[in-house]
Amino acid sequence: TNHDNIKSDMWFFPTMYLFRQGMELGIKALICGAISEKRKIQQIFLDCKHDLYMLFDAYERETVILLTEEEYGWMKKYLHSLEEVDAKSDFFRFPLEDEFLLNYQNKFLDIVDMANSILQAYGIIQKCLEIPEENRIDRFDAMRSSDFLQFANHGFGNCYLWESITGDGFHKLVLGYSQSAEFLFCECDEISKEEKVFPILFLLRNLIELGLKRMFYKTIEHGVPQNVFRSKRKSHLLYKELWKNVRPMIEYYANAQGQDISIINIVEKQIQELSCIDKNGDIFRYPTSYSLEYRFDNIDLDLKNVYEFMQAIFNFCDGCDCEFESVADWESDMMQEMAQYQDWY
C-alpha cells in the first residue's frame, strides 16, 4: 500500500475477500476433481456452504492429500482460525459486527502478516491442485503464523479497526470496493480480461448492495421504517428487498426539493435487470450453479459496458447518500433550534 492509509484501511477488505473467495473456489475445484458423482458434490456444497474448514475436511475424506505433515497441520489450524472469524464469508463484505468491534476496537490488523498467511494457505491449495511449484503463489514457511487475525502495535501501513459511535461502518467498505474495482479495471493491464472479469463484477455487485444498504441506516424523518430496517437490512435481494424499500425515501426527498424524478425510474429498471441476472449475489462468485452447470458458457462479455452500467447504478446510490447526509444535518439543526425555542419559553 506504500503506507497509504486509504488503501491500508479500506482496500484491505475487498483484497482479503478476494483471496478468501479464491481459496473457496480452489477447495471446491479439488472436491470436483476428487468426486465423480454429481449429487454427492452438490450435497457437500449445500452442507458446507462457505465453510473452508468443512470443505477441506470433505476433500481429504475423498483422496490422498499431497501435503507434508507440517503443511497439513498448518493448513488445518489456519482454516479453523479463519472460520472462527469468517464462517459465512461476509466478514470483509459488510460492516463489522458490534460484537467484533467490542473486542477489537482501536486495534491494528497487521496487513503484511495476514497477507502472507493467506497467501501461504492459497499456495497449499495450489499444491493440492498439482500446480508446479515455480507457478505457485507462495512457498511454505513452517514458522509463519496459522492465526487468521494477526495484530500490529502501530497503524503505520496497517488496518485500523475503528468506528465512531455515530458511524454506520459503510464508508470504508464503499470506498474500498469502489476503488479496488476501478483499479482492477483501469490499471491492471497485465491481468487478462478473462482472469479479472469476475472479480471486478463481484466487487461492483457488492458495492451496489452496500450503496443500497447504507441508505437503510439514515436517521431521517422519512427514512426506512424500523420494522423494515430490522427485517431486510441483511438481505442480498437488490430489487425486491433493498431498492423497493429505499425508493420511497429517495422519491419523497427528490419531490420535496423539486428535482426531476424520472431518473429514479431509469435506475429502477437497471436494478431490475441486474437482479434478473444475479438475484442472490452469487452469479459472479462461482462459475457454476449448485447443479454444476456453467453460468457463462461461450458468452462474449463486454466488460467495459457492464462496468459502466454497474458503476452508474452505484453513482446514483452514492449521490442519494450524500443528499441524505445533508438532510440529516438539516433536520438535526432544526430539532436543536426547536428545542432551544421551547427552552426559552
Model-based region annotation:
Residues T1-Y345:
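Domain-scale activation on soluble regions of proteins
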